[in-house]
Swiss-Prot record:
Its main location: membrane. InterPro entries: ATPase_P-typ_cyto_dom_N, ATPase_P-typ_P_site, ATPase_P-typ_TM_dom_sf, ATPase_P-typ_transduc_dom_A_sf, HAD-like_sf, HAD_sf, P-type_ATPase_bsu_IA, P_typ_ATPase. The gene is kdpB. The chain crosses the membrane at residues 34-54, 58-78, 219-239, 254-274, 588-608, 616-636, 662-682. It comes from Salmonella newport (strain SL254). This is Potassium-transporting ATPase ATP-binding subunit. The active site is at 307 (4-aspartylphosphate intermediate). It catalyses: K(+)(out) + ATP + H2O = K(+)(in) + ADP + phosphate + H(+). Its EC number is 7.2.2.6. ATP binds at residues 344, 348, 377-384, 395. CDD domains: P-type_ATPase_K. Disulfide bonds: none annotated. GO terms for molecular function: ATP binding; ATP hydrolysis activity; magnesium ion binding; P-type potassium transmembrane transporter activity. Pfam families: E1-E2_ATPase, Hydrolase.
Amino acid sequence: MSRKQLALFEPVLLVQALTDAVKKLSPRAQWRNPVMFVVWAGSVLTTLLTLAMVTGQIAGSALFTGIISLWLWFTVLFANFAEALAEGRSKAQANSLKGVKKTAFARRLRAPRHDAQADNVPAAELRKGDIVLVKAGDIIPCDGEVIEGGASVDESAITGESAPVIRESGGDFASVTGGTRILSDWLVIACSVNPGETFLDRMIAMVEGAQRRKTPNEIALTILLIALTIVFLLATATLWPFSAWGGNAVSVTVLVALLVCLIPTTIGGLLSAIGVAGMSRMLGANVIATSGRAVEAAGDVDVLLLDKTGTITLGNRQASDFIPARGVDERTLADAAQLASLADETPEGRSIVILAKQRFNLRERDVQSLHATFVPFTAQSRMSGINIDNRMIRKGSVDAIRRHVESNGGHFPADVEQNVENVARLGATPLVVVEGARILGVIALKDIVKGGIKERFAQLRKMGIKTVMITGDNRLTAAAIAAEAGVDDFLAEATPEAKLALIRQYQAEGRLVAMTGDGTNDAPALAQADVAVAMNSGTQAAKEAGNMVDLDSNPTKLIEVVHIGKQMLMTRGSLTTFSIANDVAKYFAIIPAAFAATYPQLNALNVMGLHSPNSAILSAVIFNALIIIFLIPLALKGVSYKPLSASAMLRRNLWIYGLGGLVVPFIGIKVIDVLLTLLGLA
């Protein structure tokens, strides 16, 4: 469930955006956008000319020059309004987050245990490494890791999700976020950041975007727009001596109007708004991007690394069968598997305990009463188990158990090898159980591929995006699930090192890679990936390594992130195409009007049949300003996105925005010309 979305044109935001748009009329603000700075300079110049004509200092039509000046100011104002409205929506989202920061005091413990002596201190004084105690009803004062206790936590202020979540020490659910509320029980938390560096602080700074850095594509497009502006500026400057030589010099007002209509003011005025709105749409999907660069990279991604569990499959693998080795009865295997899983709190571990209970009435036993030592699972060992007196029982992946058995002087039986292959071919995950160096058998864990995921992968393939499934399963299981899900490739028996190596391999081929992760062991790969979406429920290390955080902790969100990134790039490209195509109609309006008196042959270009030279110039300038206003909703919402190949997408956008950019101005300029004529202003 996402946070409540703002309407596109909230009345309060509109009023604030209008105020900010006027404030942005200062030369310092305009200098940041070179294209609009030229329009601003033209507005100032024509305003001065109007005043000079009114006072009789120079000859000319003060009414015509004044109207041109007014609409040039409107052009600048409308561009400012687009940017201010996009920024206002982001600031409104930031203000809703600021309301979460209301923790006044915290219980700072003198020792890392819940019964230690506590001091009440202002939450702002907490530093990295401080230990705090939070109880039911308290607001968590800092980002951190739970080191003791377990509690139900309301994270709706951050994620928008009303259902509470469990946070507890150990495992992947130990990370807590400052500003969330404890609903029950208590937690002892080790603060992981200093004041001003919390996740909430970074969210607020990001969505406010006051000092938003331009992305590489934005910089490249800005350079192109500046180059076009310089070319048209030089071209316009040379027209005055040509017209003067012909005996009928074009006025400065007409030359300024011509320049403004020639340069790409439409995309120049909307470019910043598109970038801000892209990050805002990402937040609307409950994904926090650390920068516009990350959103832009998402649009260029051509390789997706997707975790199998939770992304491709439902992620609730359950033990379905015990397959004993030759010479071992099924009950013995089930008993050993249950013992190895007694302290395993994963869904798979609990399902093994339950299956043993259902099949053979084997009751759970307390690890402490057995005087046993639990061996936890690690990404390196890829197995877990239990030590009871002289018994050493392990369960884990095939390769991990094989290495374990061989290191203890045993061998891997051929019949178990065959059972492993049979389980894997069915798309289930085989776990092998061993006691000492003796293989006892195989546990089959079954998972279900998500409905509709194969069709989504087919869409990504049409867009030129390669999908790679990442799994800890063996190659046979991975191949079976990959075939069922329809992914392009897979990485089986994945370790953190293997993930990192795979990302580097794709990047060496010139590809951009996106992935998700939630654990500390994912941090190196997240740091290496071009688009790294960390889960909000994940560890602090994972969130710091990624350049995006998914507040819903939904690994499938990576596909939506790519869609939003591509939509932002498409919006920018479509409006650039529309802006440049627009210029063609303006040529047919202004060039005959400006130069037909000197070169009568140019009247042949007046294909729109505009009423007079003055009405033609006014119509083009007015249309140039109004089109920015009409395109603001498109810039903020983004163009309609469909998963197509690059060539199909290019053809579609050229038809819609290229042809549209040619046709719309002809119609718009003609309509404005008719209205001006009816009003007697032409």
